[in-house]
A protein has these predicted regions:
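Aspartyl protease active-site motif detector
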Residues: 126-172, 203, 230, 234-238, ...
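Aspartic protease catalytic domain
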Residues: 17-52, 59-62, 70, 77, ...
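Flexible, small-/acidic-enriched active-site or ligand-binding loops
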Residues: 277-322
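Short strand-coil-strand connectors
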Residues: 130-137, 204-211, 262-264, 314-319, ...
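Disordered propeptide/prodomain
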Residues: 2-139, 295
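Glycine-rich flap/beta-hairpin and adjacent strands of clan AA aspartyl proteases
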Residues: 211-289, 388-444
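Solvent-exposed loop/turn segments at secondary-structure junctions
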Residues: 145-150, 156-159, 193, 220-223, ...
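Signature of the N-terminal lobe/flap region of pepsin-like aspartyl proteases
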Residues: 105-115, 120-213, 217-219, 368, ...
Length: 445
């Protein structure tokens, strides 16, 4: 049974709550999950917001598996992730077939609410509507719990690098102010990235506005970003410590909004092949079943990192395999230690790590086993249907014989990346007020 306090969830709309109310989380923590100090969340008022996702209609379907793998690895190149040369060659060949050239190399040297997100084909990216400025300017951003910059295509971006994206124009906002002397740079190991200058302005998500939010306006972007016409940039939701603005790092949208939210948290309810959503300031009891199981967050490297004790494949025996993992909505795949990936695919008779394709592949006709992650005693089950990520030999599951797996090796990273493959299977609570993360089974799954 769930013990959500409905009054606490709606207090932002109804007015101030009594000085003392039961925590909205009472009864939600599993007895087997490690409890966190300062468990009770005081609900004294504030806002809530819902941010639904929207479809990226410009997504290119062709050979999505290796492309998603490269994007996942390059994001964490600073932490030791390496992109195998054969995989880069595969990407160059794909881009050549698409007539896009070598895009990987042209680098740069308070409230509660809900935002909805809709996936690209094969769920490679989730986008959500955001408004910036006064009057509000609409942009569509990728909500990313694995980074901490809010950056956008803007009127400062060279026209040759804008390819149909909605842009932010500071000069048309009465609340925009230049943050003099501030700059930002995001660079990946393959040389791609973006950089620019910084403004402060009103940012609105799901009807909740944050004034004086740092908005990083791109003055240079790599071609790999420019080709995605539906995405205007990123809204980072990791820790402030890894924001790239110099000389002084800036706070994320969530950090600035947190004090005004009914609860100092947000949730991610990502789905397979249909719109999901992010909720800020409240927990929607209709989106999960059973208990929410919390474990502490290790924020030392700026991420929503937590301990996973092990895993099991299908109905097989549980394996003791302790490792740090990062919950990252901005990474498509689930990247784990090579031993863990190999142990999973060892239970898939047709699976092979195919250098010509760029990762683990298998016969599309094969029914994949589930993968269960043991997190603080909670068993998070990822169905095999989600792990069957994309066709590898054609552009459609209807005609494909070989499929690309959603679980791949992390090429030496000191932690695993629990990206969208994992998050589509687990309702996730990012509790910034208590520095913990919670997981629960999704409703209807």
């Amino acid at each position: 049974m769930k013990y959500i306090n409905v009054a606490a969830l709606t207090v932002g709309l109804a007015g101030a709550a009594p000085a003392k109310q039961p925590s909205a989380f009472e009864g939600l923590v599993s007895k087997t999950a490690e409890e966190v100090s300062g468990f009770e969340v005081q609900v004294l008022g504030g806002m809530t917001l819902r941010a639904p996702q929207v479809y990226n209609t410009n997504f290119i379907q062709m050979k999505r598996g290796p492309r998603a793998y490269v994007q996942s690895l390059r994001k964490y190149s600073a932490f030791g992730a390496t992109i195998p040369p054969n995989l880069l060659q595969i990407i160059d060949e794909i881009l050549g077939e698409l007539g896009l050239g070598d895009l990987l190399g042209d680098g740069i040297g308070a409230g509660a609410g809900e935002v909805a997100a809709v996936p690209q084909m094969f769920d490679s990216e989730y986008l959500a509507a955001v408004q910036i400025g006064t009057p509000p300017q609409d942009v569509t951003l990728n909500f990313d719990t694995g980074s901490s910059d809010l950056w956008v295509f803007s009127s400062d971006t060279p026209a040759t690098q804008v390819n149909g994206q909605k842009i932010y124009t500071p000069g048309q906002s009465s609340t925009s102010k230049a943050l003099n002397g501030a700059s930002w740079t995001i660079t990946y190991g393959d040389g791609s990235g973006a950089s620019g200058i910084v403004y402060t302005d009103v940012v609105t998500v799901g009807g909740v506005s944050v004034p004086n939010q740092a908005v990083e306006a791109a003055t240079k972007v790599a071609g790999s970003f420019s080709q995605d016409a539906a995405s205007s940039g990123l809204l980072g939701l990791a820790m402030d410590s890894i924001n790239t603005v110099k000389p002084q790092a800036q706070k994320t949208f969530f950090s600035n909004a947190m004090a005004g939210l009914a609860m100092p948290l947000f949730t991610a309810n990502l789905k397979q092949g249909e719109p999901g959503n992010y909720n800020f300031g409240f927990v929607d009891q209709t989106e999960f079943t059973g208990n929410i199981n919390f474990v502490p967050v290790n924020a030392s490297q700026g991420f929503w990192a937590f301990q996973s004790e092990g895993f099991s494949v299908g109905n097989g025996q549980a394996q003791n395999f302790p490792h740090q993992a990062i919950a990252d909505t901005g990474t498509t795949l689930m990247l784990v230690a090579d031993e863990m990936a190999e142990a999973y695919y060892a239970q898939v008779p047709s699976a092979q790590n195919n250098a010509q394709v760029g990762g683990f592949v298998f016969d599309c006709s094969e029914e994949l086993p589930s993968l269960t992650a043991n997190i603080g005693g909670y068993q998070a089950v990822i169905p095999g249907s989600i792990i069957k990520f994309a066709p590898a030999d054609t552009d459609s599951f209807d005609t494909a014989k070989t499929c690309f797996g959603g679980i791949q090796g992390n090429t030496g990273l000191p932690f695993a990346i629990y990206g969208d493959i994992f998050l589509k299977a687990a309702f996730t609570v990012f509790d910034g007020g208590n520095m913990r993360i919670g997981f629960a089974a999704k409703s209807g799954q």
